[in-house]
C-alpha cells in the first residue's frame, strides 16, 4: 500500500500518531546491515556445477558421484582488505565464496585467488588485516603499517612476491582462479580418507598478466566497479564464464614424506612449477562450474549471502590446518554480528558468513605499528618458497615479469619511513640478496628523484600498495 504524504496543518493530530510514517522511518533506520570487515566489496551470480569425470575412487560425496550430475549454486566474488566503496582492481587478495545446494545440505567452498596465504598462525589474522586497512590515526592507507608487518612475518613473503607481480592486479572476475587453500579430508565408507585440495581454473584464461601497475591504476580510476560490471554484462548477453575444478590428492601415509607441510597455508601444493626439486602433487579434473544468472535483488540475494568453511556435507571432514580450524569458528560468529538485525531469508539461505570480526586493539607504541604477541617463528622453507618463486618468474614469463615485480615493490616501499625500509631490506636479503639489492636500488632512485624535484613524499592516503 502506498503511503500518502504528511501535510503540516494546525489543530491536527501530532505526527507521532501517524504509525505508518513511524514504521517507514524505523524500517529505513534498519534497512542496512554492518559491512563485512573483510571481503566487503563484492558481487555475485547464480550457476551450476557439473561433474565431468569419475572420482569415485577417492570420493564418497553425493554431489560429486555420477558423471553429468548437476548441482545449483550461488557465488560471491570480493576484494579483501578495504571497504565496500574501494576499487576492485587494487593490489589485493580476491575471494570467491560458493554455496552448493546439494541433496545433503549446503556445501560451501570459500576460496581466494592464490593457492597460499600470508599466515599459518590464526592468531596473526587481526593484525594482518589491520596492516592492510586504514591508519587509525589518519584514516588513510599507510604503507608503513603494511611493510612493518611483512618484515616481522617472513612467512608472508611467498604471497607478497606474488601480489606485487603482475599476478597481483586483476581486471575481471570471469578469469580469476580460485583455490580452497586448505587440505580437507575426503572420507570413504570403510573409514579411510585422503587429504584433498580443490581449486578452480578459469577456462577463459587469466586477465592480468599483461597489465602494468599504471594500467591497473587507470582501470581503478576510470571504473572502480569494472570487474562487477564485466561479470554482470557478460552473463546478461549469454557469455557465461566457466571454470574447471581440479583436485590434488595426498594419502595420509605419504604426507609426512613430502618436503612441505600440507597443513601450512603459506605453501602451495606444487603441481610441477616450483620449487624445482620439490614434491609434485598431480591434479585431477572432476567438474565444471558455470555462472549463468544474475541476481534480481542484489542486497537480499548477494549482500546477505554468507559462507563458512564449516558448511560441509557427508564425505567431507576438516583437516587439522589451524587456519581452517579458526575460520570454522570465526565465520559463523561474524554472521551473528553482521546479520543479527536482518533475519530475512535470501533465496539461497546462508548459514555462515564470509568475514571475521576482530575486536578492538590496543597500541602501546606508535599508533600505526601493527604487532602481535603470538608471532610464530620463521622457518627456512618460508624463505625457500619465496626464493624459488622469485627465481622462477623469468622462466614463467620473461625477465620483464621479474623486473616489474621489483618496480612495484620499490614504488610501494619508497613511501615508508627509513626504519621500516631497513627492516624490509634485511628480510628480503634472507630470500635473495639479488632481490634485496634491486629493491633497495629502486627505492633509492625514487627517493633521489623526489628530492631533486622537491616533491614531498607521497601521502599514505595515496599509497599504491
Curated annotation (Swiss-Prot):
Protein name in the entry: Catalase cnsD
Natural source organism: Penicillium expansum
InterPro entries given in the database record: Catalase, Catalase_AS, Catalase_clade1/3, Catalase_core, Catalase_haem_BS, Catalase_sf
Protein keywords: Alkaloid metabolism, Heme, Hydrogen peroxide, Iron, Metal-binding, Oxidoreductase, Peroxidase
UniProt-listed GO biological process terms: alkaloid metabolic process; hydrogen peroxide catabolic process; response to hydrogen peroxide
Pathway the protein acts in: Alkaloid biosynthesis
Family: Belongs to the catalase family.
Binding site for heme: 331
Lineage of producing organism: Eukaryota, Fungi, Dikarya, Ascomycota, Pezizomycotina
Amino acid at each position: 500500500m502506498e503511503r500518502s504524504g504528511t501535510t503540516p496543518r494546525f489543530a491536527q493530530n501530532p505526527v507521532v500518531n501517524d504509525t505508518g510514517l513511524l514504521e517507514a522511518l524505523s524500517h529505513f533506520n534498519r534497512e542496512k546491515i554492518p559491512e563485512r570487515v573483510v571481503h566487503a566489496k563484492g558481487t555475485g551470480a547464480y550457476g551450476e556445477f557439473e561433474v565431468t569425470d569419475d572420482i569415485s575412487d577417492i570420493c564418497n560425496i553425493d554431489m560429486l558421484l555420477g558423471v553429468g550430475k548437476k548441482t545449483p549454486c550461488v557465488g560471491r566474488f570480493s576484494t579483501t582488505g578495504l571497504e565496500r566503496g574501494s576499487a576492485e582492481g587494487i593490489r589485493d587478495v580476491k575471494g570467491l565464496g560458493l554455496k552448493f545446494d546439494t541433496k545433503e545440505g549446503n556445501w560451501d567452498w570459500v576460496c581466494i585467488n592464490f593457492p597460499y596465504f600470508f599466515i599459518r598462525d590464526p592468531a596473526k589474522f587481526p593484525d594482518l588485516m589491520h596492516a592492510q586497512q586504514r591508519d587509525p590515526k589518519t584514516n588513510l592507507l599507510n604503507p608503513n603499517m603494511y611493510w612493518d608487518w611483512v618484515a616481522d612475518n617472513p612467512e608472508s613473503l611467498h604471497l607478497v612476491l606474488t601480489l606485487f607481480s603482475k599476478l597481483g592486479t586483476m581486471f575481471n572476475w570471469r578469469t580469476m582462479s580460485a583455490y580452497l587453500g586448505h587440505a580437507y579430508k575426503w572420507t570413504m565408507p570403510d573409514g579411510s580418507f585422503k587429504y584433498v585440495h580443490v581449486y578452480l581454473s578459469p577456462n577463459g584464461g587469466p586477465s592480468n598478466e599483461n597489465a602494468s601497475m599504471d594500467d591497473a591504476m587507470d582501470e581503478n580510476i576510470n571504473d572502480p566497479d569494472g570487474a562487477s560490471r564485466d561479470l554482470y554484462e557478460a552473463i546478461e548477453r549469454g557469455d557465461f564464464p566457466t571454470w574447471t575444478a581440479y583436485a590434488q590428492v595426498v594419502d595420509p601415509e605419504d604426507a609426512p614424506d613430502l618436503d612441505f607441510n600440507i597443513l601450512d597455508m603459506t605453501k602451495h601444493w606444487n603441481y610441477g612449477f616450483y620449487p624445482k626439486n620439490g614434491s609434485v602433487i598431480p591434479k585431477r579434473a572432476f567438474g565444471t562450474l558455470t555462472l549463468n544468472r544474475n541476481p534480481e535483488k542484489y542486497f537480499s540475494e548477494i549482500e546477505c549471502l554468507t559462507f563458512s568453511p564449516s558448511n560441509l556435507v557427508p564425505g567431507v571432514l576438516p583437516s587439522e590446518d589451524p587456519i581452517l580450524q579458526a575460520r570454522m569458528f570465526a565465520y559463523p560468529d561474524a554472521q551473528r554480528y553482521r546479520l543479527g538485525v536482518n533475519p530475512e531469508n535470501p533465496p539461497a539461505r546462508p548459514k555462515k558468513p564470509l568475514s571475521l570480526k576482530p575486536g578492538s586493539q590496543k597500541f602501546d607504541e606508535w599508533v600505526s605499528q601493527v604487532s602481535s604477541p603470538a608471532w610464530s617463528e620463521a622457518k627456512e622453507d618460508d624463505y625457500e618458497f619465496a626464493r624459488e618463486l622469485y627465481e622462477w618468474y623469468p622462466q614463467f614469463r620473461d625477465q620483464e615479469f621479474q623486473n616489474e615485480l621489483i618496480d612495484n615493490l620499490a614504488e610501494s616501499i619508497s613511501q615508508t619511513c627509513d626504519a621500516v625500509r631497513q627492516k624490509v631490506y634485511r628480510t628480503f636479503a634472507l630470500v635473495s640478496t639479488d632481490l634485496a639489492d634491486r629493491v633497495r636500488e629502486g627505492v633509492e632512485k625514487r627517493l633521489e628523484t623526489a628530492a631533486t624535484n622537491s616533491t614531498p613524499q607521497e601521502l599514505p592516503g595515496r599509497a599504491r600498495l
